[in-house]
Amino acid sequence: MEISPTKIKSVLLKLIQILFFTISISIYIDLVGNSNNKNNINNNINNEELLLNKQIQIYYWFVGIILFSIAWSIGTFKWLSRFFLTFFIIKSIQQLIQHLPIEFYDKLRNLIVFGTFSKFDFTSTGIITESLPTLYDNFFGGNISPFSIEIIGIQSCLIIFFSTLGFNIYLADKFWLIKTIIVDWIISAILLIIFSITDLLMNQSNVYSVISYIFGSNVLGFGTIKIQEFLWNLSSKYDDKLNSTIIKSTKSNNNNNNNNNNKQDDNIIYDTDSSFNGQSSSSSSSSSSSSSSSSSATTTTTTLVNDNSIISEYVTEKIMIEENGEIKEQEVQVDKLDYSKLNEDQLNAILSEPILETQITTRNVSYHKSTRFINNLIAPENINSRISAKEFVGVIILWVYTISNFIISDYSLLTIPNILVVVGFSGTILTYLSTISAKRLTNKNPSKREC
């Protein structure tokens, strides 16, 4: 049995996906484990080694999240995406408890250990009741770096905000516009010019902060997005089952269009005597009108130019259009007047007339009401069944939540450029994936930028 080259490439793509998932999850577990052992590390190394270790962890985080997003873009099963989301939620709850203020951590531990576990008898399992607080601390890693309530509140608000974008296409589109155009290009360019001048005059280095943000947002962020789009196209290209379904659907739509066109052609009556005989023209026109009344209607408008009337006929025809993967019937008006035979005065008279709404023809009115934004990045439509977009957004949000805990816990050890690279990259990835999750990869109407 001969194996097709497409099948071989598809298998290789899946092997790459498994490899990337394995590496990225290992990096994530290692990062969370280093966070749990933070107290022991801090007691054994100086500030320089701690700073180097923190920077290495940030680099690991970048490698992990990029490899994870690339692997996910190749295509995941629904159960696998939900498994990943559940795993990251559990790990994030564990991190949240680690960073609770001390009083809240103690109250939660007492509530869980002495308020819940005390109701059960652990004698048969060999667990001593007095050791339950220790087991609790070992599972959650202890209260390693307490945050203030304000910081935890800001983190929670950002998680809720980006989660909301994943369900609201209007907010996602507007935020994408603000983030990519106003912030990433206009404001960044203005600050780059201002800080370049002030740094030369005052011997400062603020311009590196702006460059770091631009690098994270427009280089790392958009670079990762383009790789994702490439893999979406590649994985759908190698999916024989999905492609065969699309081909069958396309052939079915084309057959429907051909049948409708044939029906319209059968109802057309050609009046060949209209320019030779007035009576035959009149009789032929009446027969044509009666024969085609079921499929078209004729609207006549008259324009007077120097006592010469110009008769324009707008014939209403029904055409078949494709909208959101469905074939729909739509009426359009076609002007049958031969403008090449009109003189200049007649053309000016027609152009000076107000345009009626019935004269405006369009294949899809909703397309003309939409707006096309700059940085128009579109996911392929045939990737619908391959990407669990909302789970994807949720997992990436929790990846960003992990690095935010690293940055906040040792803020004094990191430089502003290092932080801004993370902020720019995270903002671009989350904003883009939110627009994907909101509407592009569902069966709803397309995003505004897809029109």
Curated annotation (Swiss-Prot):
It is a multi-pass membrane protein. Residues 250-300 are annotated as: Disordered. The chain crosses the membrane at residues 11-31, 56-76, 151-171, 175-195, 207-227, 392-412, 413-433. The keyword 4Fe-4S does not apply. Keywords: Membrane, Transmembrane, Transmembrane helix. It is found in: Membrane. Residues 253-262, 280-300 have a biased composition (Low complexity). One of its GO terms (cellular component) is membrane. This is Putative uncharacterized transmembrane protein DDB_G0281465. It comes from Dictyostelium discoideum (Social amoeba).
